[in-house]
Amino acid sequence: MRSRNSLMRERQEAFRDARLIVIASEGKDTERIYFKALAKEYTNPRVHVHILERSEAEQNNSSPEHVLKQLNDYKEQYALEADDELWLVIDKDRWTEAMLSRVATECAQDEYMHMALSNPCIELWLLLHLVDATSLSPEEQQRWLENRRTSRRTDPYLKMRLRQEMGSYHESAYDAQMLITHVEEAIARAKALDKNPTDRWPQTLGTRVYLLAESVMNRK
């Protein structure tokens, strides 16, 4: 991790007036690949995106509580300005309501923290670039939400659907640029799914990653 002095020097020299967006995610590669590509596509001198990576010792620790700890550690080490943002990007499918509630409560109590949760997982956000989930039958929407494997050897349903739509998909290697050309559609579709935006996270099929995408694109 960069020293406090090097980060402050970077901000002073290259991003003097930039709003800092720091992203920590449950996934090791998927979110990093996507948001690096999005930030490059929407390069703006007033926005600087920094994506945290887990150390080798932390590779298998992806719980929301650990992702939140990454952001808290960052906040303690570096001086943040009033318009900076710390974003927690997590999935719903693997975690208990109690854990998510604790994390959501802590985020709500911190002016810098924002939680972008996908229900069931980040692949929903990626799929929304290519598919309008609101046009699916109730039965298909339920399959998306349940995101089951058809066997032990197959991927979860949304990964298989994403591979069908993209032609090729692996969480550590995929064509993010293909998706980003449709990011405006993804945002509109995610908003349409977000029936109760005041809830702490989507209780049904939905993703709040669109809020982070809008921030990276400087649509605030």
Describe the role of every protein-language-model region.
Residues 25-26, 90:
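Conserved residues at beta->alpha junctions
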Residues 27, 31, 59-68, 204-208:
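Phosphate/oxyanion-binding active-site loops and adjacent basic polyanion-contact surfaces
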Residues 20-24:
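Conserved beta-strand elements of the Class I
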Residues 2, 6-18, 33-57, 75-87, ...:
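C-terminal accessory helical subdomains adjacent to catalytic cores in phosphodiester-
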Residues 69-74:
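Alpha-helical scaffolding within the catalytic cores
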